[in-house]
């Protein structure tokens, strides 16, 4: 669980990021969950976008993906949201989040 101060730091880092995943009109299935897990393992902090034609809104998609991957939801704004999952070793954000 992130504190509000840690969440603010991560929001600042995610501000300039482009979305790496897009939630479309299909279900959030195992393939997408595995792709998000792989991306979180590589980057720790990712931004995702939900299309207007999706059956989910950004809040619903963020909750579902955060639960499925074990990540923390950092921010939800409009159709975009940010997820964070700290690496066990060599975390890029560990020093910032102390």
Name every feature range the model reports, one short phrase each.
Residues 1-98:
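Positively charged, polar, low-complexity stretches
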């Amino acid at each position: 669980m992130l504190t509000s101060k840690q969440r603010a730091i991560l929001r600042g880092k995610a501000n300039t990021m482009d979305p790496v995943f897009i939630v479309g009109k299909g279900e959030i299935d195992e393939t997408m969950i595995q792709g998000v897990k792989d991306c979180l393992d590589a980057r720790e902090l990712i931004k995702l976008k939900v299309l207007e034609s999706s059956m989910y809104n950004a809040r619903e998609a963020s909750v579902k993906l955060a639960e499925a991957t074990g990540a923390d939801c950092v921010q939800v704004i409009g159709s975009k949201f940010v997820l964070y999952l700290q690496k066990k070793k060599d975390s890029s954000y560990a020093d910032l989040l102390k």
